Amino acid sequence: MHRYEEQTSYLVGFIYVHRISDIRVGGTSKRNLKMFQRICGTDSFKNVTVVTTMWDKVTSEEGEGREQELKQSDVLFKPLMDGGATMARHDGTREPALKIMQWFSDKNDTVVAKIVDELVKEKKNILDTEAGKELQSDLRNVLQKHQKNLQALEDEIREAKQQGDKNVEEEAAVDRRKVLEDIAKVKWEFEKLRNTSSKKFRCVSSFVLCNWF
């Protein structure tokens, strides 16, 4: 394993996989994409390949239409494409997979992931990196949503008590307990992020970049 304090980890590129069969792209997928962009950094977009899969689940017309929508959407892949990223299709067979790997092997330039550059060269704290800020923002948004739901349920319980409606009160109380559990989980994620050492985070981020994206 590299010693990241002394040696920067260089990569040939990054792969982001997306199902072309997805009719719409949900909030979770958009957040994952944004996090991917923060980890890579705009300077590395030229070394990104967006691989679309599940082409056997759509007609050629449907797939090509969605492909164009993905390329042209500002909240999806347009920022990557504008930065020099490429898009490739994978139909589940061996040939397109080999072509994608060949594209990477033919590249002469290497890149350093933004997250690695921030932690190693700039000596930033995890929370001050672009990816760290993005994750904190996501966690805050989720926490605010849960807290809003909690307030609504507490209002519902209070109103049910005033009206003597035991069924509504009990159902709302069950939902309230679930929301409190969700809030506790988000707060735990916050604490875990704050307590993660920079060295450990560098190792994890490098592993993720090499094995997941």
Predicted regions and their residues:
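Inter-motif core of Ras-like GTPase G domains
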Residues: 1-24, 33-43, 49
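C-terminal non-catalytic interaction/localization modules
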Residues: 6-9, 43-46, 56-213
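Mixed-charge, polar/low-complexity N-terminal
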Residues: 30-31, 36-37, 125, 132
